[in-house]
Amino acid sequence: MDQAKKYANLLDSFRSSTEDILLLERLEVSDKPIYVLDSSFNPPHFAHLGMCLSIPKGSQLLLLLSITNADKPVAPAAFNERILMMEKLKTLIHNCTVSVAICKHALFVDKCRSISNKLGPREQVYLVGFDTLIRILDCKYYKEKAMQQVLQPFFSCSQILCFSREVDGTTTDDQAQYLEKIKKSLLPNIPSQWSEKIKLTKLKGNVGFGVSSTRARQAIISGDEETQRKIIPQEILNVIKVIQPYRHR
């Protein structure tokens, strides 16, 4: 696929540049909040699409891929192949203006700063799953400084919209209780006022139930087409069949 080579070249140029974030599509200047779906997109699935379709009509949305991950090694699919899949995901989102973006930062506070520098000082709303929320508030990622000190700038200009769904043995009740513990200052190193910046919501219907990138990859590698269709939009499956990003597994 010529597009795969194009994105491979783009990534090479980006890595060697002084830029720390790159938007593949231009967004109009605005003072309205910008929504950010930061994910590995490995591959994009129905839960990703459901999150994107849940934001207010007419909003601006970044599909953000970090080429530096805090705790996940680089594995198939390659980054240029993920961008191809992200661009296809973008075509399925009709309620807002979307740009695919790549960045060099692993931590959300650094991503937030880069977006502010690129798009101006506007509120950012991060669309995350519960597993990502837990990682954002995990002290192990902030060893050099206290987590409160590092994350305060992030929460001063950002909100987290956390999509609660039962996955990996964690119930929605467990997730709601976690936020209640933050509100009541029952979790060490997490100020209670941060709970005002975190909102729990749910995807409509059964969208996202049992969906994860790990399960999607397993279904692709094993050839389980029925599970693939349940987890991954057909348009993205069509791209996967052409570029075969998991062929080396």
From Swiss-Prot:
<feature type="binding site">
    <location>
        <position position="129"/>
    </location>
    <ligand>
        <name>NAD(+)</name>
    </ligand>
</feature>
<dbReference type="GO" id="GO:0016887">
    <property type="term" value="F:ATP hydrolysis activity"/>
</dbReference>
<keyword id="KW-0539">Nucleus</keyword>
<feature type="binding site">
    <location>
        <position position="165"/>
    </location>
    <ligand>
        <name>NAD(+)</name>
    </ligand>
</feature>
<dbReference type="GO" id="GO:0005634">
    <property type="term" value="C:nucleus"/>
</dbReference>
<feature type="binding site">
    <location>
        <position position="40"/>
    </location>
    <ligand>
        <name>NAD(+)</name>
    </ligand>
</feature>
<keyword id="KW-0662">Pyridine nucleotide biosynthesis</keyword>
<keyword id="KW-0548">Nucleotidyltransferase</keyword>
<dbReference type="GO" id="GO:0000309">
    <property type="term" value="F:nicotinamide-nucleotide adenylyltransferase activity"/>
</dbReference>
<keyword id="KW-0963">Cytoplasm</keyword>
<comment type="function">
    <text>Catalyzes the formation of NAD(+) from nicotinamide mononucleotide (NMN) and ATP. Involved in the salvage pathway for NAD(+) biosynthesis via NMN.</text>
</comment>
<dbReference type="GO" id="GO:0009435">
    <property type="term" value="P:NAD biosynthetic process"/>
</dbReference>
<feature type="binding site">
    <location>
        <position position="97"/>
    </location>
    <ligand>
        <name>NAD(+)</name>
    </ligand>
</feature>
<protein>
    <recommendedName>
        <fullName>Putative nicotinamide mononucleotide adenylyltransferase</fullName>
        <ecNumber>2.7.7.1</ecNumber>
    </recommendedName>
</protein>
<keyword id="KW-0067">ATP-binding</keyword>
<dbReference type="GO" id="GO:0005829">
    <property type="term" value="C:cytosol"/>
</dbReference>
<keyword id="KW-0520">NAD</keyword>
<feature type="binding site">
    <location>
        <position position="131"/>
    </location>
    <ligand>
        <name>NAD(+)</name>
    </ligand>
</feature>
<keyword id="KW-0808">Transferase</keyword>
<dbReference type="GO" id="GO:0005737">
    <property type="term" value="C:cytoplasm"/>
</dbReference>
<feature type="binding site" description="in other chain">
    <location>
        <begin position="214"/>
        <end position="217"/>
    </location>
    <ligand>
        <name>ATP</name>
    </ligand>
</feature>
<feature type="binding site" description="in other chain">
    <location>
        <position position="48"/>
    </location>
    <ligand>
        <name>ATP</name>
    </ligand>
</feature>
<dbReference type="GO" id="GO:0005524">
    <property type="term" value="F:ATP binding"/>
</dbReference>
<feature type="binding site">
    <location>
        <position position="41"/>
    </location>
    <ligand>
        <name>NAD(+)</name>
    </ligand>
</feature>
<dbReference type="InterPro" id="IPR014729">
    <property type="entry name" value="Rossmann-like_a/b/a_fold"/>
</dbReference>
<keyword id="KW-0547">Nucleotide-binding</keyword>
<comment type="pathway">
    <text>Cofactor biosynthesis; NAD(+) biosynthesis; NAD(+) from nicotinamide D-ribonucleotide: step 1/1.</text>
</comment>
<feature type="binding site">
    <location>
        <position position="206"/>
    </location>
    <ligand>
        <name>NAD(+)</name>
    </ligand>
</feature>
<comment type="similarity">
    <text>Belongs to the eukaryotic NMN adenylyltransferase family. POF1 subfamily.</text>
</comment>
<dbReference type="InterPro" id="IPR005248">
    <property type="entry name" value="NadD/NMNAT"/>
</dbReference>
